[in-house]
Amino acid sequence: MTTKPTRIRRGFITEVQVRWVQNGSLRNVEKSSDALAINVLAINVLAINRSIMSLRCREKRPLMMRLMRRVIAAFDQKLRDIRYQAVPRRAALLGLISSIALLTGGCATISPRNVLPQANAGQIDLEGFHNIRFWGDASAPAIEAIVMADAPRAQAQSSPVSNLLAISGGADDGAFGAGLLVGWSDAGTRPMFDLVTGVSSGALIAPFAFLGRERDGQLREIFTKYERKDIYIYNVHGLIDGSALADDTPLAHLIEKYVDAAFLQEIARERAKGRILLIGTTNLDTQRPVLWDMGRIAMSNNRDAISLFRKILLASATLPGVFPPVRIQVRVGGKDYDELHVDGGITRQVFIAPSIFSFVAGNQKPARTVTKRRLYVIRNGKIDPEWQSVSENVLSITTRSISTLIKNQGIGDLYRIYSITKRDGIDFNLASIPSDFSEVRSEPFDPRYMNALFDRGYDLASHTYSWVKSPPGLELTPQARN
């Protein structure tokens, strides 16, 4: 006997489908491959969610919600069981979200936003702060006007060489950059940087690199002592009543642990010397990169400075869909609004604001005579193509495509930076994870993997690391080097 569908205004779910969800597919999840299991569960979520949405969150919702939560629980368990190996972490998570992005909506419990109107989107100052941020894609004169306005000035360093550092994102691959910096310190050749920039996991490294080798012990600890549960907790229920797949409260607590009042005072002291620390986030409403002058925040004497400092670091590391976006409160015309900020790597995986090259050394008093400028770029990832057999299913294809997109976006950022250095006569130096590094993760933020990667970076830098002088595909000939 054919089961009559329970018809609803926009879509339907049959009793057969309900029993399939309750009995068949859930029993088979543990026997399925990861990709197949996730796709089966996603289909189940689709069927139930269509019904919930069509009911407009009213009658008959309890039954559908119970079924939904059971499927989500199985989905959650499957995610915990997955052993991410060859697939990059960010791409794997984005792939999962892309596969189920259309499955959710309608009944969210997120508090409503008071979105900053488009007409006021150019509002750059936050109440109580001045000249602490600027658009990362603004014209060079606009950036220079903000960074140089009322700029702290101090006695110039005696060195005629100006050293600049840019650190990319990379999630747990940030262990490479951390190890490289610590090894560089122990080799006795790491310079003091006039400018440090960071994005995503690079944003968590940058403040420690900015403060110098005295903070190397903490940098090592952050990237070798913690595991996934110390960074985030799976929250698949967020797919139906939230804004993210995971809860990043543990990461927020870690940031609070290391970024305390004394830390902020050190940042402020170095900014007073004319040194600059920039962290990048992405404003989702405007689709634009935002660069934050963290030293000015530290120097502001605003009681909310430490909270904002921490919030920006968290926002820069917030992969949208995986972690909830960070709301930044702004006040315009006596009214309170909010902006949504996420991973700076969405718009720039590594960055240097071009106009800063021209005046970072002149930001000191008396004006410093610089005869040479060096830029060091740490790319926390592999640059070379990596072969992988891709299964012909939605999840595998989506994940592989996104990982390829991310890798090539990062290479494009390197090309952009390289062209600026060639134009302005700056010595370009690039470090990235060696292609022969073969350690495999058992899960995201696997301590064994991160320790091995940290050690690899440390060993390279402590034995006179050979920095690459150009991005991939632009290898210089001996004549060009001269």
Label each region the model flagged:
Residues 89-93:
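N-terminal export leaders
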Residues 96-98:
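Hydrophobic helical h-region of N-terminal Sec-dependent signal peptides
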Residues 103-106:
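C-terminal motif of bacterial Sec signal peptides marking the signal peptidase cleavage site
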Residues 197-198, 202:
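Gly/Ala-rich beta-loop-alpha elbow adjacent to hydrolase catalytic centers
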